Amino acid sequence: MGLRGIVMYATPVCYLFAEPAELYFVYRALYAQYCCRLHTVSSQTGDILQLSRQFECVFQESHPHLYYHLLAIAAPPLKLVFNWIVFAFAGYLEVGQVMALWDRILAWDSLLVVPVAAAAILAFREKRLLECTCADEVHLVLADASTLQVVQLLQLYLFKDRIDALRD
């Protein structure tokens, strides 16, 4: 993983604690329980292979047109979001949004929310992504995450059918 990975995981936690000792113990527990699985290949639930597969299945099933469009322009969806998943969005989303997502990980005691969040972000950017003709354009569309509200995107992605049914 290296120093970059440690820093990526530790930085959001630094906003929560003034005392280094508290920070260390919380970070250690977070890493031991969740983050280490993002760098492990195993048969355990929540390892990086399972999360990658989960992303591909969820995204392909919910947005097949976008999924195949991205493949056609040499921008495989998993390749686009892999670092988001590996670092649980640290370094991509704003710190407050990372903390909101990590709160869901802790609440559900599961990393499965991470690939769903990745699919939700691609789905949210669907219109602009479908206009892209090459991988470089896709990267430009996804580069700015400053306005993303991850909890709202998750809710919209997971409950869109129910929301639409309530409107009818």
Protein language model features and the residues they cover:
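Helix-rich, well-folded core regions that mediate interactions or catalysis
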Residues: 1-168
